[in-house]
Swiss-Prot record:
Protein name: Glutamate-1-semialdehyde 2,1-aminomutase
Gene giving rise to this polypeptide: hemL
InterPro entries, per the entry: 4pyrrol_synth_GluAld_NH2Trfase (IPR004639), Aminotrans_3 (IPR005814), Aminotrans_3_PPA_site (IPR049704), PyrdxlP-dep_Trfase (IPR015424), PyrdxlP-dep_Trfase_major (IPR015421), PyrdxlP-dep_Trfase_small (IPR015422)
PANTHER family: GLUTAMATE-1-SEMIALDEHYDE 2,1-AMINOMUTASE, GLUTAMATE-1-SEMIALDEHYDE 2,1-AMINOMUTASE 1, CHLOROPLASTIC-RELATED
GO (cellular component) term, any one: cytoplasm
Lineage: Bacteria, Pseudomonadati, Pseudomonadota, Gammaproteobacteria, Enterobacterales
Primary location: cytoplasm
Enzyme Commission (EC) number: 5.4.3.8
Keywords, sorted A to Z: Cytoplasm, Isomerase, Porphyrin biosynthesis, Pyridoxal phosphate
């Protein structure tokens, strides 16, 4: 047995499923998950000593690559002053100044410890600010594991939500309406059925949890207009897209202004950080200045703030996002060319430093139904064959891939060459 297999066997006796987050267990592709020893730049190294070109990037945070010296040094320097104080620090102020400068729609920001905390808190704030209970989310979009968000669509677009996890009371889920991504008609229908009850829409501006599905040109502006028409708030969940699709996020890339923004992943530089913020009048409703409660023992942790501050300063340097786009575009085009040579139908969506690979005969993939029609079994085989070639992709047909500026064009070309060999046998 390999070291990964031995560790996985031991882990399953001690940790549910052997992992601390389900997708890591390779349940979406089968087989034994890799146990990682270290990472540097664009590469992961497993406990058996094998190196992989990494397109998971810790599920998004590693936009600069692994073990970036500026972040590592910031963490070491901060740790030497203490690990946690439970009191305000100067770095929290500096971090808030930087975030609000980089994302102009955020007048104020509150730091939390995860993307789930950010979305959960933003929704509570939207409900408290509007005095309404219902929210709209989209089929195939993921916003963390808060109870009100673990909801699937019912039998029709306007049915009340049903829990998609045991442990979520139906009374919670009934306040969540699930509409179809990229379908404004379904959203208008929900508003017309509940015109005075919907507090907010929460949306991934690029859906990264049904692989990678960009918005149609009219979709995000249409959501903004509907929120304005019916007095609801628009929450853009940029946990995945923030500082990756563009420096000011997907909201800037697509030209739409939310009322609230949720951030995570890159904002922590690899440390557990989330944030939410937006309009001053809305944020003023948050405790201690307002009645909507939110708190956290480790929120604004000095080590995490130092890592995030260093990361964002590097991400804000000229050329970073142009490099991400160039590398991702080359990878997408190369994969499509290699698939076409092998006669394999393939769609590759990409925006900024995000991409998604779909085995499908369709010309495009624009919604959850399109994603579900793709050939998942072929993806599973592709994943494992690429892993054997030393390329680490997301171990699920429903997760986006992530580029970093640490990837070289040689890494990209080697990945395309590996895919060409795999497609020939697929």
């Amino acid at each position: 047995m390999s070291k990964s297999e031995n560790l996985y066997s031991a882990a399953r006796e001690l940790i549910p499923g052997g992992v601390n987050s389900p997708v890591r267990a390779f349940t979406g592709v089968g087989g034994t998950p890799l146990f990682i020893e270290k990472a540097d730049g664009a590469y992961l190294y497993d406990v058996d000593g094998k190196a992989y070109i990494d397109y998971v990037g810790s599920w998004g945070p590693m936009v600069l690559g692994h073990n970036h010296p500026a972040i590592r040094n910031a963490v070491i320097e901060a740790a030497e002053r203490g690990l946690s104080f439970g009191a305000p620090t100067e770095m929290e102020v500096k971090m808030a100044q930087l975030v609000t400068e980089l994302v102009p729609t955020m007048d104020m920001v509150r730091m939390v410890n995860s993307g789930t905390e950010a979305t959960m808190s933003a929704i509570r704030l939207a409900r408290g600010f509007t005095g309404r209970d219902k929210i709209i989310k989209f089929e195939g979009c993921y916003h963390g594991h808060a109870d009100c968000l673990l909801v699937k669509a019912g039998s029709g677009a306007l049915t009340l939500g049903q829990p998609n996890s045991p442990g979520v009371p139906a009374d919670f889920a009934k306040h969540t309406l699930t509409c179809t991504y990229n379908d404004l008609a379904s959203v208008r229908a929900a508003f017309e059925q509940y015109p005075q009850e919907i507090a907010c829409i929460i949306v991934e501006p690029v859906a990264g949890n049904m692989n990678c599905v960009p918005p149609l040109p009219e979709f995000l502006p249409g959501l903004r207009a509907l929120c304005d028409e019916f007095g609801a708030l628009l929450i853009i969940d940029e946990v995945m897209t923030g500082f990756r699709v563009a420096l000011a996020g997907a909201q800037d890339y697509y030209g739409v202004e939310p009322d609230l923004t949720c951030l995570g992943k890159i904002i922590g530089g690899g440390m557990p950080v989330g944030a939410f913020g937006g309009r001053r009048d809305v944020m003023d409703a948050l405790a201690p200045t307002g009645p909507v409660y939110q708190a956290g023992t480790l929120s604004g942790n000095p080590i995490a703030m130092a890592a995030g501050f260093a990361c964002l300063n590097e991400v804000a340097q000229p050329g970073v996002h142009e490099t991400l786009d160039e590398l991702t575009t080359r990878l997408a085009e190369g994969l499509l060319e290699a698939a076409e040579e092998a006669g394999i139908p393939l769609v590759v969506n990409h925006v900024g430093g995000m991409f998604g690979i779909f085995f499908t005969d369709a010309e495009s993939v624009t919604c959850y139904q399109d994603v579900m029609a793709c050939d998942v079994e072929r993806f599973k085989r592709f994943f494992h064959m690429m892993l054997d070639e030393g390329v680490y992709l997301a171990p699920s047909a429903f997760e986006a891939g992530f580029m970093s500026v640490a990837h070289s064009m040689e890494d990209i070309n080697n990945t395309i060459d590996a895919a060409r060999r795999v497609f020939a046998k697929l």
